[in-house]
């Protein structure tokens, strides 16, 4: 049964659409998919609007995006829904991580909001974690969704010029640099997105090297 399940989800298409309008995410996912030797497109290539993400989990929102783009493009679609959760803030912003940056995607403002909020917490532990859910959907409705998580500490002030989003204020456990200070290639090997993609590779892209 397990072997049959795995065969049903092996990616054999010649094109794939990244269901995202976030240039940082598109760049990271495109790099991960590069060894596939397939045409990698993105939602902007089809002038698709962003669907309403009303899921209560990262996995639900990832599925909403991949299903929407796959259905409207007629091509298999890979989506990412990710965010950061601060233990001192009851795991906020979580699935609302992008919304905290506002319509203008001002993550400097969002990071300042995080810092201001944590300052008000008595005896903060500064623990936080990034979560990434990846969802691969086909036009026929078939789908598979996986997730990855990396734990770390909140760091202030923001440091680093690489990465995007909340990377400048997150230091993964076992390291002394923020995600934004790490070379992108190294960050891609240890991030929440990398962990989720490793799971997806084993199920859908077995030809890719680990």
Regions found by a protein language model. Name each.
Residues 1-5:
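Short, Lys/Arg-enriched N-terminal segments with co-localized hydrophobic residues
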Residues 7-17, 23-208:
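Anionic-ligand binding patches
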């Amino acid at each position: 049964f397990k072997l049959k399940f795995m065969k049903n989800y092996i990616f054999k298409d010649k094109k794939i659409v990244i269901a995202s309008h976030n240039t940082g995410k598109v760049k990271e996912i495109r790099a991960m998919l590069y060894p596939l030797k397939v045409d990698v497109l993105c939602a902007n290539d089809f002038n698709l609007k962003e669907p309403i993400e009303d899921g209560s989990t990262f996995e639900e929102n990832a599925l909403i995006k991949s299903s929407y783009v796959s259905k409207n493009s007629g091509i298999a679609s890979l989506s990412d829904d990710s965010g950061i959760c601060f233990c001192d803030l009851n795991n906020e912003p979580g699935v609302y991580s992008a919304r905290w940056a506002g319509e203008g995607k001002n993550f400097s403002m969002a990071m300042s909001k995080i810092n201001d909020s944590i300052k008000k917490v008595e005896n903060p532990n500064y623990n936080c974690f990034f979560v990434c859910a990846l969802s691969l959907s086909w036009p026929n409705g078939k789908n598979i969704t996986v997730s990855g998580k990396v734990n770390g500490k909140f760091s202030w002030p923001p440091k680093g010029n690489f990465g995007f989003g909340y990377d400048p204020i997150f230091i993964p456990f076992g390291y002394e640099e923020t995600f934004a200070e790490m070379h992108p290639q190294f960050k891609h090997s240890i991030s929440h997105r990398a962990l989720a993609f490793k799971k997806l590779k084993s199920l859908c892209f077995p030809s890719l090297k680990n």
